[in-house]
Amino acid sequence: MTTPIGAWSEVGKLREVMVCEPRLAHRRLTPSNCRELLFDDVLWVEKAQEDHRDFVAKMRERGIVVHEMHQLLSEVLDISEGRSWVLDRKLSPNAVGLGVDEDVRDWLNDMPSDTLAEYLIGGVAYGEVPADRRKHVLGALIKAHSENEFLIPPLPNTQFTRDTTAWIFGGVTFNPMRWPARQQETVLASAIYTHHPIFAERDFKIWYGCAEADHGMSTLEGGDIMPVGNGTVLIGMGERSSWQAITQVARSLFAQNAARRMVVAAMAPDRASMHLDTVFSFCDVDLVTLYKPVVDTITPLVLEPSSEAAGFSVRVDDRHFTDVVASSLGLDGLRTVETGGDCWEAQREQWDDGNNVVALEPGVVVGYDRNTATNALLAKAGVEVVEIKAAELGRGRGGGHCMTCPITRDPVDY
C-alpha cells in the first residue's frame, strides 16, 4: 500500500524528502555578515556542495525520492501564476519598499526560471541590477547604499529545509520563523507547496501559518516539531518556537482529529540547543539519542483535546521527558544513547550535531562523521550510522535532521 503524503512518524521508512544544496546564498556569506545570517563561519562552498551531493546520493541509494529546493522553485517559476505569486511577495512594500517593484520587476521577470530561482534564494545586491533599470526610487537607493548591500537578502539557511515548513501526519505548517534572516524562506517554501504540480495534485491539510501574515509573537520552526506517531506530536519550546504558535498548531490538530496529544518540551533558550532536534532525535522505534544536560532539564507540558475555550487542556508532567514520550507511544520506556565522550567531548559533539541525526528507516540514520564517540555508541546499540562529512555543512549548526524536510514517511506501529 502506498503511503499517503505526510510525515507519519520520526523513524518509519523515509519515502520522499526536500533538501536545499548550498549555492549562491552561501557564496554571499562573509566574516562580516555570517553572524547576522545565523552562520558561525563562512563555507568552502564547492566542498559543501560535494558533501551535500554525497548526502543526497546516499539517500537515493536507499530508494528515497529527493527533491532539491532550487529545482522545485524553478519549476514553480515556469508557471505564470506561480511566478507572479512569488514576485508579488518578494517585491512587496514590506519586503523591498514602495517604488522598487516598478524598477526591478520586469528585469527579474525576464530571467529564465533557474536563474530567477538562484537569485531568489541567493539574494540580489543593488550593484547587480543593470544600470538601465536603476531608475526612480532604485536609483536613489543605490546612491544611499553600497552596491554590495542587498536589495533581496540571501537565504543561506534554506540549507536547513526542516525548519520553514513541517509535515505533521497528513498536513503541513507554514512556519513563521524566529529571526528576520530566515523569515523570507517560508514564502518560497509556501510557493512550492501551493503551486508545484507534485503537490497541487495531492490531498493534504495546511495546519497552521500563512506566508503573508504578520504572526507577531507566534514563531515556529520545524526543528522543534516531531510527529512521532500514536497520535502524538512533540514540539520544543525554546529559542525558536513560541507558546503562541505551538498552541495554535495544537488547536488546529485537535479540532481536525489529527492528533490525540501534544507533548511540549519547554527548554531554556540557547543557540547550542536552538531546536529540540539539536538535543534529541529518534534512531529506532524505541531508541533515541540525546544530550543529557539539556534533556534532563526539559519540563514536559502535555496538551490534549478538551471542551475548554482554547480547545485543549494543559498539564505539567513531572516525569522525565523520555518517560513522558515513551508512555505517549505506549512503550514501557525508551532506549537512550547519550552524546558520546567525556563532558568536554560531549559538549563538542552536541555542538557539532551529534544528536541531530535523521532516520532513513528504523535503525538506520545519517549523521556527521566528526561525531566519532556518539556514532560509536549508536553502532553499539545496533544503529547503522551512514556518515556524511561535517566540516563545511555543519557551519550553520545543523545536521542530517535539519537538512531534510520529510514529505512522505511511513507510520510506525506502536
Swiss-Prot record:
Give the GO biological process terms: arginine catabolic process to ornithine; arginine deiminase pathway
The record lists the catalysed reaction(s) as:
L-arginine + H2O = L-citrulline + NH4(+)
> Does the keyword 4Fe-4S feature in the UniProt annotation?
no
Q: Under which EC number(s) is this enzyme classified?
A: 3.5.3.6
Pathway named in the protein's UniProt entry: Amino-acid degradation; L-arginine degradation via ADI pathway; carbamoyl phosphate from L-arginine: step 1/2
Hydrolase as UniProt keyword = yes
Keyword entries, A-Z = Arginine metabolism, Cytoplasm, Hydrolase
Q: What is its main location?
A: cytoplasm
**Which cell locations does it reside in?**
Cytoplasm
> Which Gene Ontology terms of cellular component type are present?
cytoplasm
Note the superkingdom of the native organism: Bacteria
State the active site: 402 (amidino-cysteine intermediate)
Return one GO MF term. arginine deiminase activity
Enzyme class, first EC level, given as a word = hydrolase
Q: Which Gene3D superfamilies match?
A: Arginine deiminase, L-arginine/glycine Amidinotransferase, Chain A
What the record says about family reads: Belongs to the arginine deiminase family.
NCBIfam families given for it?
PRK01388.1
State the PANTHER family in the record: ARGININE DEIMINASE (PTHR47271:SF3)
Q: What is this protein called?
A: Arginine deiminase
Identify the species of origin. Answer: Cutibacterium acnes (strain DSM 16379 / KPA171202) (Propionibacterium acnes)
Its ancestry begins with:
Bacteria, Bacillati, Actinomycetota, Actinomycetes, Propionibacteriales
